[in-house]
Amino acid sequence: SRGLGDVYKRQGFIMQLITERLFLIPLQPDGMRALLARTTDPELVQPYTDMLDLSLAHPDQWVWYTAWGLYQNDSGDWVGDLCFKGLPENGHPEIGYGLLPEYEHQGYATEAVRAACRWAFGQPGVTAVEAETDPGNTASQAVLRRVGFVPTGTMGEEGPRFILRKKT
């Protein structure tokens, strides 16, 4: 858990999503600062810094910019995080996610992405959720497919793009 479980305890959170094994909490600025302080992966420092800055710059829409902590229901341990990459453009927010290595390949990402997409579809104007993965990240592509995403046939900056359309 790398000591991140206490991030949610200090959150004073205003919303959370609960799944069978997880709860998801969008991190407020103090939670983002705690996450940044404990981040050991140098590739995550800049994205987390950007998320904090953007959530502060858009206080009325901060949930679309911040990281959402993923915690185990039973232990409260930090499993990973996900994010929407800003306000939905054309009703299509983009989702990103990552888990600590010890929690990979156990269905946590599928569970979290499914819950986050369900939440997004409950927000005004959201008609689809998009994602893109590294071309070699077949595990992430499998997560997206299990949730119901389909390939768009286009490439983004990170790799192939996927879309999940809201059921009408």
Language model features with spans:
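Short, small-residue-biased leader/transition segments that mark boundaries at the very start
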Residues: 1-8
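Structural motif
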Residues: 2, 123-124, 147
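GNAT-family acyltransferases
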Residues: 9-94, 99-102, 115-119, 123, ...
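Conserved active-site alpha-helix within GNAT-family acetyltransferase domains
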Residues: 110, 135-152
